[in-house]
């Protein structure tokens, strides 16, 4: 159901903000239905997938005991000019966001997905891991590998939440 929901939002221009797994689901959906990578998946769900567009980081692939092996805490990322996310963040080049996950966008598929129209809006500064994806010709289709809810406050929502609300109001 999650992949179908992401597809429905993408195809019908409904604002979509995928957080962590939601970003991964959006990537899987895009790979399958836009790039034609039948069976694209996450190795979390199918270790034998033909197209592992979401996978464990290479250095974690041999870890059997998963305890304390997550990517946790704040991480500096470069955000690219010309993206919606760059505008939402106030046109700053560096952002700091908090993480709690193991699986990542597989860099082996980056070029192929970009050729199909997926925009990589942000990557981590140390590892070069994909942090934000977008679809440029969509009113608001953004996936964030991090957790923007960790930096939101009642009177100061995270920029991506503000962007989602604004896009929802404009497209209702």
Locate predicted features.
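A broad, low-specificity signal marking well-ordered, structured residues that form hydrophobic/aromatic
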Residues: 75-77, 142
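Cysteine-nucleophile active-site neighborhood
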Residues: 1-75, 82-84, 154, 161-169
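Generic beta-strand/beta-sheet core signal
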Residues: 17-22, 28, 80, 121-123, ...
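Short, surface-exposed acidic
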Residues: 39-43, 92-99
